[in-house]
Amino acid sequence: MRNLLHHAIVIIGGGPAGLAAAVCAKKNGVDDILIIERDTKLGGILNQCIHNGFGLHTFKEELTGPEYAQRFIDQAEELSINYWLDTMVIHISEDKMITAVNGERGLCHIKADSIILAMGCRERPRGALNIPGYRPAGIYNAGTAQRLVNIEGYMPGKEVVILGSGDIGLIMARRLTLEGAKVKLVAELMPYSGGLKRNIVQCLDDYDIPLRLSHTVVDIQGRERVEGVTIAQVDEHLCPIPGTEETYSCDTLLLSVGLIPENELSEKMDISLNKKTNGPLVNECLETSIEGVFACGNVLMYTILLTLFLRKPVLPENMQHSI
């Protein structure tokens, strides 16, 4: 087979979990490590999280997302850990043969003794919400809007309604306000917020942004561009209550309605998945149903506290035996 390579450990994903796993493996005596990252730089989602609040547990100081990611990148480079950027893994076989492609190397086949899945998670799209209305411009996932503002330098809109009170949505409510947009409200389907209390206070209360619990978007107005949204209160069965509709004019709707693990590779490998989280089922050593294949970070399940996963052991004893 052309371009056949071999590595002791291959880590799919160069975000904080993948970097932490690589550093841990290197410090435990594994020298032959390869990180494969599909983006143009390491760091994962943290590169667009320019707010502070990271690093208190791991580094004992408050850092922004990029600063936090850079700490792990620096450790990986100091340990001479090999990594490929701008590389997409398109298939992994049950015998741990990885097929990847990038512009420099073309199609590559990599045989790994052990694999760590650290692909992270993705946002739940509008299609999963069954919101009536047309499909005008101006509807974004909160993470997409975060990247547009923080990395690309674009404002998604001037008048914004946010559906969902996850932490990304709360943080973007503050960010857009600081950039000059008017955030009309944050609507949350559940009778409680999905974000941290700290973020509710710092991102909504401090800027007088209303949080409407037990409310959801039932209609989107506009054909070419969002012109307004209609929200309604929901009952205990999460069904809209007739007569409670309210319409708000806006040009942008942000969706912050949950994150789901990137599980396409896991499904192709026939790894057993957790029906509640859609991430791989793992044992106490974070090993999946396939021997020698491990998973860590948000690919298991989304957690609002990054340090919960970074503090877990990512190089258990049976992984050391497998390599």
Predicted regions and their residues:
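Residues forming the flavin
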Residues: 1-323
